[in-house]
Amino acid sequence: MAGNATMTHLVLGIDPEPLGMAPFIMATRLYPEVLAADLGLAGIVHPRARAVVFPAFGAYVGGDITAGLLASGMDRDARVRLFVDIGTNCEIVLGNRDWLLATAAPAGPAFEGAAIRCGMRAADGAIEVVTMT
């Protein structure tokens, strides 16, 4: 299971309140082993199947980012790479197999156009073309 720290805390029954106020401390970064059935997967998987819960980097860089880094192979690559996850929040990780730097910031205001003076909000026509090279 991979999710942000708040969602993971809620699913596992861990109090998420400390995540909502400074200094944004997680109760734990390594989650307990759980049965998949306890996560609502009874009848879908074997009754004794264990669920793997990906650990979080911190309060705003959760297990979903850990899972993404592992899936992308960034943790095994000698080249410096950039991993970006844009949603309500934006998490960015820069690094390679030897080091990783992670940060997070709210992305909603950027898409909503809050207090913009130039350009436009995220709407039809905001992006004219995207080229991958």
Regions found by a protein language model. Give the residues of each.
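Short glycine-rich phosphate-binding loop at a beta-alpha junction
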Residues: 1-4
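Glycine-rich phosphate-binding loop of actin/hexokinase-like ATP-binding domains
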Residues: 18-33, 67, 77-133
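Nucleotide/phosphate-binding catalytic cleft detector across ATP-hydrolyzing
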Residues: 6-82
